[in-house]
C-alpha cells in the first residue's frame, strides 16, 4: 500500500489515502470557516459604516472641535509636565552647585564665569583709560 519513493536521494513514504483525505477535509473546513468569518466581518463593517456615517455627518461640527480641544489639552498637560520636570532638574542642579557638591557641568560654568569676569575687567580698564585720557586733554 505505502511505497517507498526516492526524491533527490532521499526516501519518502507515500501517506495512506485516508490520511490525505483527513488532511484535505481539515484544510477545507478551516479555510471555509475563515472565509465565512471574513465575510461576516465585512458585512458587519459595511452595515456599521452605513448606520454611523449619517451620525458622523450630523455631529461633525461638534466632534471636530471637540477632538481638537482634547488634543490641545492633552498636549498642554504633557508640555507643562515636561517643563515641570525640567524646572525641578535645573533647581536641583543649582542647589547642588550652591552647596558645593560639584554637579556635572560646574567646571564649564566656572570657566565661563572667569572668562566673563576677565573680559568685564578688561573693558572696565579700557573705559577708565579712555575717560582719564579725555579728561586730561
UniProtKB/Swiss-Prot annotation:
The keyword Transmembrane applies. It is found in: Lipid droplet; Membrane. The modification N-acetylalanine is found at residue 2. Keywords: Acetylation, Allergen, Lipid droplet, Membrane, Transmembrane, Transmembrane helix. The chain crosses the membrane at residues 27-47, 55-75. Expressed in seeds (at protein level). Its main location: other. GO terms for biological process: lipid storage; post-embryonic development; reproductive structure development; sexual reproduction. It comes from the Eukaryota. InterPro entries: Oleosin (IPR000136). One of its GO terms (cellular component) is extracellular region. It is a multi-pass membrane protein. May have a structural role to stabilize the lipid body during desiccation of the seed by preventing coalescence of the oil. Probably interacts with both lipid and phospholipid moieties of lipid bodies. May also provide recognition signals for specific lipase anchorage in lipolysis during seedling growth. Belongs to the oleosin family. This is Oleosin Ara h 11.0102.
